[in-house]
UniProtKB/Swiss-Prot annotation:
InterPro entries: Alpha/beta_knot_MTases, RlmH-like, tRNA_m1G_MTases_N
Protein family membership: Belongs to the RNA methyltransferase RlmH family.
Subunit structure: Homodimer.
Protein name as catalogued: Ribosomal RNA large subunit methyltransferase H
Residues annotated to bind S-adenosyl-L-methionine: 100, 119-124
Length: 151
């Protein structure tokens, strides 16, 4: 199972270190990949959002299950997320997770998404969102495989 996370913006060094940390642990469960998509700096906010959404859409793995991380999404427990991931794994589905830029995503992407999740009612930087998503994927696989996941 391939898990691609595509995020708008350049990630800080400490975030990249965290990504390496989780990628190392995740490799026994899946093939993780984080793609940094260059931010758009020119144009109106609407034009920026449209172009960034288009750039994210172009990074969707063919035939994959598309998840969008957005504050309007559904909040689930780690156990519920593990059940969801297990179902996708059993179906042999790859996953593409999309994380928008500071202005968010346009509505087109929500029509392409199979599921929209929110991590919290709080707001996180895009880099922190990537780390939290990777941690939750790792936690989900530990739950799926009956391994201890409390550290």
């Amino acid at each position: 199972m391939r898990v691609r996370i595509a995020v708008i913006g350049k990630l800080d060094g400490f975030i990249k270190e965290g990504i390496k940390h989780y990628e190392k642990f995740l490799r026994r469960f899946c093939k993780p990949e984080v793609l940094e998509i260059k931010r758009v700096h020119r144009g109106s906010i609407e034009e920026i959002v449209r172009k960034e959404t288009e750039d994210l859409t172009n990074r969707i793995l063919p035939g994959s299950f598309v998840m969008v991380m957005d504050k309007r999404g559904e909040e689930v427990s780690s156990e519920e997320f593990a059940d969801f991931l297990k179902d996708l794994e059993m179906k042999g589905k790859d996953i593409t997770i999309l994380i928008g830029g500071p202005y968010g995503l346009n509505e087109e992407i929500f029509a392409k998404a199979h599921r929209v999740f929110s991590l919290s009612k709080m707001t996180f930087t895009h880099g922190m969102t990537v780390l939290i998503v990777l941690e939750q994927i790792f936690r989900a696989f530990k739950i799926i495989h009956g391994e201890n996941y409390h550290y």
